Amino acid sequence: MNAQPQPAAAPRPAANGRGSRGSRRPRRPYDAVVVGAGHNGLICAAYLAKAGRKVLVVERRHQVGGATTTEEIYPGFKFSCCSYVVSLLRPWIIRDLDLPRHGYEVLPLEETFTPFEDGRYLLRDADPERTKRAIARFSPRDAEVYKQFGQKMGELGRLVKPMIDGPAPDPLTHNPLEILRLAKIARHVRGQGEEWLIGNVKMMTMSAVDFLSEWFECEQLIAPMSVSGIIGTFLGVRSPGTAYVLLHHYMGEIDGSYRAWGLPKGGTGAIAAAIAAAARELGVEIRLQTPVARLAMKNGRATGVVLENGDEIAARTVISGLD
C-alpha cells in the first residue's frame, strides 16, 4: 500500500466529524480476531458469532484443524496426523453448533488389541465378560479387579468433570462470586471423604505405571493401559502426573454413552471441517495461509494482529488458539 503523492486539496471531514484525515480513528471491522484455526479456536469463534459478534479467524496453514487434521501423507492414504480419537468434545457443543448436519459422525471404538512378542495377545472390548476372560489368561486376580478399577475411575471422573467443564478457578481472586464458586468446589471435595481425597491425590501426582501397579499385577495389562496416560503429552508412562491423563479415558462420552470413545468418520480433520462449516454459517470469516507475525499493542493492550505480510487487522478482542 504505497500511495503516490497527490495534489493538495481541501481537507475532507473525517468519519468521526473532526475535520482532517489525520484525526480519523482506525476502523475496527472485527469484534474479535482468533489466531489459529484449531478446533478450540473454531469453537470459540463460532460461539462468538452465535452471540452476534463479527469474528475473523486467521490460520497459518492451508487447512483448518490444528491438531485435528486429516492429511494424505502417503499417496492414496489419509491419516489423522495428531489427535485420532474423540470423546471429550462436549455434547452441548455438538448440539449448539448442529455438527452432525455439517458432517460430524463418530464410530464407537469398542475394541483394543495388544499383541505380545511371545505370540499371545490381549483383546479388550465392550463385552465385560469377554474382556474378563481375556485378562484371566494372564492373571485371574487382575480379571476380577478390572471391573472394580473401571467403576472407581468412573466415580472419580464424574466428580472431576464439573470442575473441568467450568472456568479454571482463581485462588487469588477477590470477586465474591468467584470466592463462592471456590467454596462450593471445596465443600464438594471435602464431602467425598478421606479415601477419595487420598485416591485423588495419588491420581493427580503418580505416574500411570505406578498408579496402575497399585491395582494390577500383570504387565500384559498394565502396559497397554498405561499408554492412555501419555496420549497428547511429551511424557513417558513412568512420568509423574500421567495417571491424571489416564483418568480422561474414563470421562469420555459419545451420544450420551459415558466412558465411551470413538473414531471420527473421515479422520479428526472431519471434526474440524464440521466446526468450520458451522462457524462460517454463523458468519465467521476464516482466512487460511495467513500467518500472524505479532500482536498489535497499545498501552499494554492487544488491539489486533500484524500479519507476516505487514497488514494490520484491528479488533476489540484478540484470542489466541496457539499451543
Regions found by a protein language model. Name each.
Residues H39, Q289-A293, N309:
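Conserved SAM/SAH-binding loop
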Residues R25-L172:
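N-terminal glycine-rich phosphate/pyrophosphate-binding loop and immediately adjacent elements
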Residues R27-Y30, L307-T317, G321:
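Core beta-strand elements of the Rossmann-like FAD/NAD(P) dinucleotide-binding domain
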Residues L288-T303:
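A conserved short coil-to-beta-strand element within the FAD-binding core of flavoproteins
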Residues A278-V292:
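A conserved beta-strand/loop element that lines the FAD pocket in flavoprotein oxidoreductases
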Residues G154-L282:
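Active-site/ligand-binding neighborhood in enzyme catalytic cores
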Residues M1-V33, K50-A51:
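Extreme N-terminal leader/targeting segments of oxidoreductases
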